[in-house]
Amino acid sequence: MNFFEGELHRMFGGNDIIHDPKIVGRTLLGKLDDDLRVKLQFVSTEVHKHYDAIQISILNRTDGVVDKETMLFGDIIGVKNTNISGRVNPYMWEEGVGKAYWYTPVTASDKALIADTVLDYVGMYQSEGMAMSL
C-alpha cells in the first residue's frame, strides 16, 4: 500500500456511505447504490505533484458522469503553518518515485474533517432506500 492508498483508506475506510470500495494509487472507487458509483481522487490544482484537493465524481454506471466537484483541502481545514514556507494551503507532495507525504502538518482530526465533508457531499446522492437501511 502506497502513501496515497493509505491516506484514502484511513479517511474513507469503514464508512457507511461508500460500499465495496476499491483503492488504487490516488483513487478510490465505490458503490453508492445499484446505479451510482463514486470516484474520489487526490488531484493537483496548481503545481504538479502537489495534491491539494480531492476530486469527487458521481457516476451513473450506464450514463456516465452525474456530478463532479473538487474540494481544496485549504477550504476544508484552513491554511497551515510550516517552518519553511510560512502559511500555506495543505497538500500532499510526491517528491519522487514512491516518496510522498503531507508537506504541511495535517492532524487526524483534520483528516476526519476532510472525510466528513466529502462524505456529507457524497451522501446527497445515496438513494433513500440505501440510507434508510443503514
Segment roles from a protein language model:
Residues 1-7, 23-134:
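Intrinsically disordered, low-complexity regulatory regions enriched in serine/threonine/proline
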Residues 12-21:
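N-terminal segment of the mature soluble domain
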